[in-house]
UniProtKB/Swiss-Prot annotation:
InterPro entries: His_Pase_superF_clade-1, His_PPase_superfam, PGM_Phosphatase. This is Probable phosphoglycerate mutase ARB_03491. Its main location: secreted. Belongs to the phosphoglycerate mutase family. Its EC number is 5.4.-.-. The record marks H283 as: Transition state stabilizer. SUPFAM superfamilies: Phosphoglycerate mutase-like. Keywords: Isomerase, Secreted, Signal. It comes from Arthroderma benhamiae (strain ATCC MYA-4681 / CBS 112371). It holds the Pfam family His_Phos_1.
Amino acid sequence: MAGRILLGLTLLATSLPLLAMGDAAVVPCISYSTVPGYFLQDDPAVDPKTFDYAKEGFGLIDQAYDTDETLDAELKKLPWRRFEHKVRSLNKHAASNVRFAVLFLGRHGQGFHNVAEAYYGTKAWDDYWSKLDGDGTITWSDAHLTEEGISQAKVARDTWAGQMKNSIPLPEVYYTSPLDRCLATAKFTFSKLELPPSKPFIPTVKELLRETLGVHTCDRRSSRNYIESTYPTYKIEPGFTQKDMLWDPEVRESDSDRDARLKKLLDDIFSHDKSTFMSLTAHGGAIRSILNVIGHREFGLQTGAVIPVLIRIETSTDAPEDPEEDLTIKIQGLN
């Protein structure tokens, strides 16, 4: 079964582009770093346990930028417009292999698995209950949102609506985990917002954006047919299988393997998507890995919370890989 995880990740990894150079292939190498100083969550003095993203308007720091002088006087009054102008200026003046992007990372609202873990305790949950589909009272296989979870997603919706009045730059693209709690959170957060026709809410379901793989049934996704019928307006990425090929009932993904998987996800996104402002609806563990990959300080999110991050993306190329040379080396190694 563990081989299925490796096979699935390998197949997904092959979707990343290779740049042809004669008979050799150049493998794009993408590195990420956080650009700090724009959001309160960047500050080590800010406590994630008490921080209220909704009250803080997603945490944008109201400050002057060196690009303000090129804005109209009225737009200078709007912190989000000044921030957007700054980000677009960074991209305008960046090297050809460098770009900047803003990720709005949203954790799903409370799911039934969260309720069960709180009720039974983490040890009993990890040792026993998480391996079952439910306890006879509630079901947590591919856990759905509770009423509280739906309310949390609507808080995120209201926060977006409030900041839209302050000219927040809207996501140009939406991505979501294929697990139901994220699919539903994205729907309750964005589907009722008055978005412009140029930036509609049509999320793309990304297999690699899901929570830690294996063992816990709450992290086993439903079939492709279920997702397509329940969320008919969502797009599903190419290669998305009917059945869950990544979940293993015997093997739980390590934190380092999860980091590597989320790095592949970011590589896939930034190899194909030129958007600057992006929304990703995901999980506590997945977001923890993304923050680790981009070099952000650790910042745990409560269910339903959102953290924005400004990141720098740099693409370089490794030395060309020559299949014939590689084969020669292997043959020589047999002598």
